[in-house]
Amino acid sequence: MFLGTIYSFKTNTRTPCLLELAKRLDLQVDLVETYHHKFPTDLAAKFPLQKLPVFIGADGFELSEVIAIFKYFYEKGKHNDKEGLGPINEIEEAEMLKWMCFINFDIVTPQIVRPWVDMFRGSVPYEDKAFKESAARAIDSLKIINELVKDRTYLVGDRFTLADLFFGSMLRRFFHSIIDEKTRKELPHLTRYYVTMFHQAKLEAYYPLELPLTVTVPNN
């Protein structure tokens, strides 16, 4: 069934989980390439905060906030969930939501990803001290996750779930931009978790697995 249209771009941190979930649930969604710095006027009228991704259903239903969109997709397609991605009881549902909120609201936040992510993208000039200090703060936060996944293969239960699809895909920006070989050795459990979830979430359909030897900021 055609569900509607996602407005974002394919490699946006919060977009691949939506595309992959829709694919696994046999939901047809379109992706209209949309960027923060070129947010269409008509779309801004519907979503004045101009955050990505946003979704407009085939029936005109408008929805923002990635967790809300993600959960809406699952509810619309859960009859096609042949992998057991969803919760089997209220406890699992609460645990899945906990992990999604944690990565979305406590880790992938402006306080943790800026200014290093903006410098990496070239949207602000590179400044060595600011880049390294902000990247170090981000890595300190990732050390918390490293301990949380130390004895876990999956976040909820003993199978790949919605929580892993969401959480794993949200880690990409860190591994792509600021986690070099030395740092991966400091984050062995997180690295194992990310690589495992990268493959189980089939994220190679959206971007390659990038585990750089060194951090190199592109010349802008």
From Swiss-Prot:
Which keywords annotate this record?
Answer: Cytoplasm, Transferase
Q: Which family does it belong to?
A: Belongs to the GST superfamily.
Output the Pfam families linked to this UniProt entry: GST_C, GST_N
SUPFAM superfamilies named in the record: GST C-terminal domain-like, Thioredoxin-like
Q: Which GO terms describe its biological process?
A: cytoplasmic translational elongation
Role description: Involved in the oxidative stress response and detoxification.
MF annotations from Gene Ontology: glutathione transferase activity
Q: Which residues form the GST C-terminal domain?
A: 89-216
For whether the record's keyword set contains Cell wall biogenesis/degradation, the answer is: no
Q: Which GO terms describe its cellular component?
A: cytoplasm; nucleus
Q: Where in the cell does this protein reside?
A: Cytoplasm
- Membrane-crossing ranges are none
Q: Which reaction is this enzyme known to catalyze?
A: RX + glutathione = an S-substituted glutathione + a halide anion + H(+)
- The name on file for this protein is Putative glutathione S-transferase C460.02c
* CDD domains listed in its UniProt record: GST_C_EF1Bgamma_like, GST_N_EF1Bgamma
UniProt key word Manganese? no
InterPro entries named in the record = EF-GSTs, Glutathione-S-Trfase_C-like, Glutathione-S-Trfase_C_sf, Glutathione_S-Trfase_N, GST_C, Thioredoxin-like_sf
